[in-house]
Amino acid sequence: MKRERIRRRVAALDTSNQIALFGQAPASIPEARPGADSPRKQAPRFEEPDPRLIRINEQRLDQLLEQVGQHAPLKIRAWLGQMCFSEFEQAYPPGGRPAYAPRAMLGVILCGIMQGISSLRELERFARTDLGCWWVSGAIMPDHSILGRFIQRHGGLLSEQFFDQLTHKVLKLTGSGTGVVAGDGTVIEAAASRYRQMRAEALAQALQAAREAAQGEAEAGARVEQLQRAQSILDSRREEREARGKDASGLSINAREPEAVVQPQKDKQRYAASYKPSVLANDKRVIVAAQVHASSETAVVEQLLDQAQGQGKIDTALFDAGYFATDVIVATAKRHIELLCPEGQSQGSDWNKHSDKRLPKSGFDYHAEEDCYRCPAGQRLSAVGCYKGNASAPAYTEYATRACAGCALRERCTRSAQGRRIKRYAIDAHKDALRAKMAQPQARQRYAQRQAMVEPVFSTLRHRQGLQRFRRNGLAAVRVEFALHAMAYNLSRALAQLFARFINGLLTHGHPSLRKVAALLSHAVVAMSLQRGSTLCSAALHAR
């Protein structure tokens, strides 16, 4: 049987514009004009849903929040909408899948912290279940890893530029400034187990064991690097302590969190690896500056003052007796800021409370015209020598007397066979002037407002925002975490001030029946949390 031939269509190709492999190329190829048909540079895209499109039972979400008296989320979203996030957006590359908008991400984090939620997994659950958070963020639902990467990527902005921007906004909302600020600090435990604290001997043994097990194992090698870093930090701390003439044999460190210092906690009953955050607050209890140091509250005073002066001029700074130090006096004098700070552990009417076991240096009166000291027993201490000082130790003049042998106060004054000796430094003239100022009734009265300005700040951070312990490792990460808590606290203060203004309006211009209600609310709000106060503020604004 003869097969039929299959006929296929043959396509004719136009080869007139083609060039042979070894043929002669055209003399020139026309260049495209720059920018004519070139693709434009893509800007990063962000996912920021409109919460006005969210409906629950055919009712808009904002209407539902107003109906139940939850106006705080409405206010927070409006305030965040007035902030600038361009620096955040510049950190994202163009193209690809749209990222969650920085405004929405920060709304989730701050709203959660205001309600005492700071764990990343708890924030993930909060973003999925809280209606107020839906309105602030547009109902985005990031998981804990996305939240963690956002904080890590923008840590520098969150703790510096954006903190200053939000603080400026809150100062305008509260109608307050930085004329008078009060400073304080506390100690907060680090994210490290107290059972992993090691002294120098145990650390050396652990490092030796890790080195023996590190042959060919990447994880063991990382452990060696961690222990080496901890040993280096511990050695530097021991050298610094010995240079000051103190015993360093009892120093310990946590290898998992070596930047944290093992120090006594607030209850004075235990030691743990921890950090010391410090703040400056104004008369409306708004945090105008926040810093964190590993072990010192006075070491960050200069940074606090500079950060606060970025918001406005500081006239007076109030610090407790723990800040009666050279660094603080010099920092305030250099910036022409009036300092009110007592010496010793001032409590009640006793402004210079010291231990009865030893007479302090402040109990000796210096007489500049005679260049001598007078001790509490009336004896004269004359200059017996001078020290010129060096790069590590300041110069001083030493004063002494031979009348200590038969003095009735010797047991309380000195145990030295040579008698009591007083060293006078250049800074002592400023300390004497500060003591004289704090002895005046007007200065005491002005200083008395410090406790109400700054003491409630850390109480709120600990008990209302859940800052009993840091969750991130390393000093840099801890600073970012504390800045987030400070920003959430400031938003709560702005909401509380709105509530206070509404109550004052009712007390001044309201109907007599409304005045009674306002009086009851003003007494009740003292015992309420800021979260509850924000809700009352929302209800008050709605009623108005």
Regions found by a protein language model. Give the residues of each.
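Basic, short loop/linker segments at the boundary and entry of helix-turn-helix/winged-helix-like folds
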Residues: 65-110, 115, 426-430
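Short, low-complexity intrinsically disordered segments
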Residues: 77, 132-133, 349
